[in-house]
Regions:
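Hydrophobic, well-ordered secondary-structure elements that form the walls
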Residues: 127, 161, 221
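Short, conserved, GDST-rich strand-edge loop motifs in beta-rich repeat architectures
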Residues: 16-22, 26
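Single conserved hydrophobic/aromatic residue that forms the stacking wall/gate
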Residues: 1-6, 11
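Non-catalytic accessory segments flanking enzyme active sites
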Residues: 51-107, 152-153, 164, 170-176, ...
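Extended hydrophobic/aromatic segments used for targeting, binding, or gating
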Residues: 87-146
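Blade-edge beta-strand/turn elements of extracellular beta-propeller
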Residues: 31, 35-47, 82-94, 135-144, ...
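Short coil/turn segments that connect the beta-strands within blades of beta-propeller domains
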Residues: 12, 60-62, 111-112, 158-159, ...
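Polar, glycine-rich mid-to-C-terminal structural blocks
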Residues: 25-69
Length: 263
């Protein structure tokens, strides 16, 4: 048996990764159902032992994304799932030491676009979009690098995208409008909290599932109604012992360090 890593991804046939002697995922294979394993096709191999290999499917189900990365460097490739799976993967951005990036696929005005979150000359990360047909072409800046606003993640859906970021210690979620590049924060009642996008596998859904917690609110799952912008409580961790959040308060005090930094 081959040394398998992770789970198989069923896309017309089956894709899987195998590992080397150091248990490093290094090779992506295509298995056609009903054929011998000996006939499996090697789609990609990463020889550099500093890099691990992974693969996934965009939420749109349009592209296979092959991701190669180390702790500080990324390189990603695309395979069009509507075409030949054995065609040479299309490189997005060639690897450069110290540059990390991740991508999402969206369709904007009928055009396939890649939204790329990266730290190329952007310590707190920047969000750009490029044509999927020419990822190394002109970059359209969606969210410019802004010191103090750390972009954490982006998820693309059919009609909008989510942007997760941290500012002044709070992790927040905003909704990105493809047409205007405007980001509108999802508003919560508490002044201090941590919020993030939860599992949302569907390309098009009327609801967005969110994870939420604070110093006084236990782990909570909300669904945001995208039409009304109303939050609906779906699940919350029970706290034993007669806990009442109204018996507690939370606040944040700032101090100024000797170099002028607020902490």
């Amino acid at each position: 048996l081959r040394s398998l890593v992770g789970s198989e991804m069923c896309i017309r046939d089956s894709l899987y990764t195998t590992r080397d002697d150091a248990w490093r995922p290094d090779t992506l294979w295509l298995h056609r159902l009903g054929t011998p394993v000996a006939d499996d096709v090697k789609l990609f191999h990463e020889p550099d032992e500093k890099y691990w290999l992974g693969a996934g499917i965009t939420r749109s189900r349009r592209y296979l994304v092959i991701a190669v990365g180390s702790s500080i460097t990324s390189e990603e490739y695309l395979v069009d799932l509507e075409g030949d799976l054995t065609a040479a993967p299309q490189i997005v951005w060639p690897r450069r030491e110290g540059v990390e990036y991740s991508l999402e696929h969206a369709v904007v005005d009928g055009e396939d676009r890649l939204y790329i979150l990266h730290n190329d000359d952007a310590l707190d990360f920047e969000l750009v979009s490029v044509p999927a047909s020419d990822p190394q072409g002109d970059r359209h800046v969606v969210l410019a690098h802004e010191p103090g606003r750390r972009l954490l993640g982006m998820d693309a859906f059919r009609d909008f995208a989510t942007v997760e970021y941290r500012r002044e210690g709070l992790e927040r979620v905003g909704l990105l409008d493809y047409a205007t590049d405007a980001v509108n924060d999802i508003v919560f009642d508490e002044p201090l909290y941590s919020a993030g996008v939860s599992g949302n596998p569907e390309w098009h859904s009327p609801f967005l599932r969110l994870g939420y917690t604070s110093f006084v609110t236990p782990g909570t799952v909300y669904e945001l109604d995208l039409a009304t912008r109303e939050l609906h409580l779906r699940k919350q961790v029970a706290v034993l012992g007669g806990y009442d959040p109204l018996d507690y308060g939370q606040k944040r005090d700032w101090a100024t360090a000797s170099d002028g930094t607020r902490v």
